[in-house]
Amino acid sequence: VPFLLAFGANLLFSFSATLFTDFSREVSGKWINSFKLCIAFICFALTAVVLGESPVWSIAPYFLLSGALGLFCADHFLCTAFAKLGSARTLMIFSFSPLFVATWSFFLFNEEPSYSKLIAIFFFIACVFTLSIEKFRKEGHWEIPGLLMALFGIVLDGLGNVTTRYALNINPNESVMNVCALRALGAFLGFLLFQPILKTRLIADFKKLSRRKKVIVLIASTIGTYVSLTFWISAVKIGNLTSLIALSGTTPLLAGTFEIAMGKTKATSYLAYAFVLFLIGFYFLIKN
């Protein structure tokens, strides 16, 4: 169940990321990140009001911090990288995230990944390496600033996930919606804090979009944050964090597939090899 929830979250985010890339290039990375986190905050706030659940306030600061790190800071770097690398190439770096999270989880939660999980991580990284070679052979160079932006995004996203899991270990009974709402609030507060520096023209730039693009960005922001995060936190609450993060290796493959389906790029033999590596890795990931 946790793997299916995590895969669902990755599927939705990968699809949304291909659309976020368009807006990162057309407007800016900081704009699409700020816009989608505001949509997430509104959706989760409304859901929290409707459900009427009261959060455990003693652990609320952890979720606020997690949201600020993962949903605001990490996604700011990722959306900036989208404009430079594209969604698939940016998300491919996420397959290295298990190495960071496994280390933190080992020291904080005593989570020791099994040998099959380690093998899965190896194949996911091989999947990323395959896509990396394609980028280099096609363009003859590495997009260093974009890669660094993506790397910063990974580290901050991993810290956000570890912080969330730490708080859930303190109180496993906290509801998924409360966790999501508090994380979204943390991201929104981060946006308000840094707005004088970022100077994001949230409403003005939105008004400049065509009616069709307004609908697209609203739908992408909703499924890429509200729905995707609900699935992801549900998985984190009941699953092994390192294994779930390893499954994020699916995101570049999924994003690449969506890019092909939407006519943004062409299918290549590298993508086919990456798909095979992913299937092998996924087999070891779910193997007992």
Residue ranges of model-derived segments:
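Selected transmembrane alpha-helices and immediately adjacent juxtamembrane segments
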Residues: 145-169, 177
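Residues that define the loop-to-transmembrane-helix transition and helix capping
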Residues: 30, 88, 114, 174-177, ...
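Alpha-helical transmembrane segments of compact multi-pass small-molecule transporters, enriched
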Residues: 39-43, 93-108, 122-123, 186, ...
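Hydrophobic core positions of alpha-helical segments in small-molecule transporters
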Residues: 8, 35-36, 66, 93-96, ...
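Interfacial helix-capping/hinge residues at the ends of transmembrane alpha-helices
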Residues: 16-21, 29, 78-79, 90, ...
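Hydrophobic transmembrane alpha-helices of multi-pass small-molecule transport proteins
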Residues: 42-44, 103-106, 116-135, 270-287
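Membrane-interface interhelical linkers
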Residues: 1-31, 35-65, 75-85, 133-151, ...
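Hydrophobic/small/kink-forming positions within alpha-helical transmembrane segments
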Residues: 14, 45, 68-72, 98-103, ...
